Amino acid sequence: MSDEGKLFIGGLNFETNEDCLEQAFTKYGRISEVVVVKDRETKRSRGFGFVTFENVDDAKDAMMAMNGKSVDGRQIRVDQAGKSSGERRGGYRGGSSGGRGFFRGGRGRGGGDRGYGSSRFDNRSGGYGGSSGSRDYYGSGRSQGSYGDRSGGSYRDSYDSYATHE
């Protein structure tokens, strides 16, 4: 229930920190939490964050008022965290739950996708092993090629063909 007042803030300037974000949103109501998501290794902002309001109506007001506005020189996107935004950004979530590699590969666009895709197919077919392993390997090679050739949301197609290998 506490997530109802939580907003996803995308498109942040990499210099924007929690204090800047709080200043931009505090005029819409009492804020219980502000988080700018940072890269685990470099500790730099990843360009998005979350603002949680104590009151759901305040969060909705802030979302309507701030979506598309400029913060620290960058136009931001404001969406409700979880429900509606989760469905729209399902590609990221689906990829990360399918295997952490797909999430990172998806961000790489192209080479990264194929690298992660092929290793997942190879590991899987190797697990079923035996003499059919070589046939599965070539099958995944074809699938990987078509996966790499199609761009944009094609990982779902790969999952469909992936299911037929099992």
UniProtKB/Swiss-Prot annotation:
<dbReference type="InterPro" id="IPR003954">
    <property type="entry name" value="RRM_dom_euk"/>
</dbReference>
<feature type="compositionally biased region" description="Gly residues">
    <location>
        <begin position="92"/>
        <end position="115"/>
    </location>
</feature>
<dbReference type="GO" id="GO:0009792">
    <property type="term" value="P:embryo development ending in birth or egg hatching"/>
</dbReference>
<feature type="region of interest" description="Disordered">
    <location>
        <begin position="67"/>
        <end position="166"/>
    </location>
</feature>
<dbReference type="GO" id="GO:0003729">
    <property type="term" value="F:mRNA binding"/>
</dbReference>
<dbReference type="GO" id="GO:0010494">
    <property type="term" value="C:cytoplasmic stress granule"/>
</dbReference>
<dbReference type="InterPro" id="IPR035979">
    <property type="entry name" value="RBD_domain_sf"/>
</dbReference>
<feature type="compositionally biased region" description="Basic and acidic residues">
    <location>
        <begin position="157"/>
        <end position="166"/>
    </location>
</feature>
<dbReference type="Pfam" id="PF00076">
    <property type="entry name" value="RRM_1"/>
</dbReference>
<dbReference type="GO" id="GO:0016477">
    <property type="term" value="P:cell migration"/>
</dbReference>
<feature type="compositionally biased region" description="Low complexity">
    <location>
        <begin position="133"/>
        <end position="156"/>
    </location>
</feature>
<dbReference type="InterPro" id="IPR012677">
    <property type="entry name" value="Nucleotide-bd_a/b_plait_sf"/>
</dbReference>
<dbReference type="GO" id="GO:0005737">
    <property type="term" value="C:cytoplasm"/>
</dbReference>
<keyword id="KW-0963">Cytoplasm</keyword>
<dbReference type="InterPro" id="IPR034278">
    <property type="entry name" value="RBM3/CIRBP_RRM"/>
</dbReference>
<dbReference type="GO" id="GO:0009411">
    <property type="term" value="P:response to UV"/>
</dbReference>
<dbReference type="GO" id="GO:0003730">
    <property type="term" value="F:mRNA 3'-UTR binding"/>
</dbReference>
<dbReference type="GO" id="GO:0030371">
    <property type="term" value="F:translation repressor activity"/>
</dbReference>
<keyword id="KW-0217">Developmental protein</keyword>
<comment type="function">
    <text>Cold-inducible mRNA binding protein. Acts cooperatively with elavl1/elrA to stabilize AU-rich sequence (ARE)-containing mRNAs by binding to them and inhibiting their deadenylation. Essential for embryonic gastrulation and neural development, acting to maintain the expression of a set of adhesion molecules and cell movement during embryogenesis. Plays a role in the specification and migration of pronephros cells during embryonic kidney development.</text>
</comment>
<dbReference type="GO" id="GO:0060212">
    <property type="term" value="P:negative regulation of nuclear-transcribed mRNA poly(A) tail shortening"/>
</dbReference>
<dbReference type="GO" id="GO:0019899">
    <property type="term" value="F:enzyme binding"/>
</dbReference>
<dbReference type="GO" id="GO:0005634">
    <property type="term" value="C:nucleus"/>
</dbReference>
<protein>
    <recommendedName>
        <fullName>Cold-inducible RNA-binding protein A</fullName>
    </recommendedName>
</protein>
<dbReference type="GO" id="GO:0043022">
    <property type="term" value="F:ribosome binding"/>
</dbReference>
<dbReference type="InterPro" id="IPR000504">
    <property type="entry name" value="RRM_dom"/>
</dbReference>
<dbReference type="GO" id="GO:0048793">
    <property type="term" value="P:pronephros development"/>
</dbReference>
<dbReference type="GO" id="GO:0007369">
    <property type="term" value="P:gastrulation"/>
</dbReference>
<dbReference type="GO" id="GO:0048026">
    <property type="term" value="P:positive regulation of mRNA splicing, via spliceosome"/>
</dbReference>
<dbReference type="GO" id="GO:0072004">
    <property type="term" value="P:kidney field specification"/>
</dbReference>
<dbReference type="GO" id="GO:0045727">
    <property type="term" value="P:positive regulation of translation"/>
</dbReference>
<keyword id="KW-0694">RNA-binding</keyword>
<dbReference type="GO" id="GO:0048255">
    <property type="term" value="P:mRNA stabilization"/>
</dbReference>
<dbReference type="GO" id="GO:0003723">
    <property type="term" value="F:RNA binding"/>
</dbReference>
<feature type="domain" description="RRM">
    <location>
        <begin position="5"/>
        <end position="83"/>
    </location>
</feature>
<dbReference type="GO" id="GO:0009409">
    <property type="term" value="P:response to cold"/>
</dbReference>
<dbReference type="GO" id="GO:0070181">
    <property type="term" value="F:small ribosomal subunit rRNA binding"/>
</dbReference>
<keyword id="KW-0539">Nucleus</keyword>
<keyword id="KW-0346">Stress response</keyword>
<dbReference type="GO" id="GO:0022008">
    <property type="term" value="P:neurogenesis"/>
</dbReference>
<dbReference type="InterPro" id="IPR050441">
    <property type="entry name" value="RBM"/>
</dbReference>
<dbReference type="GO" id="GO:0005654">
    <property type="term" value="C:nucleoplasm"/>
</dbReference>
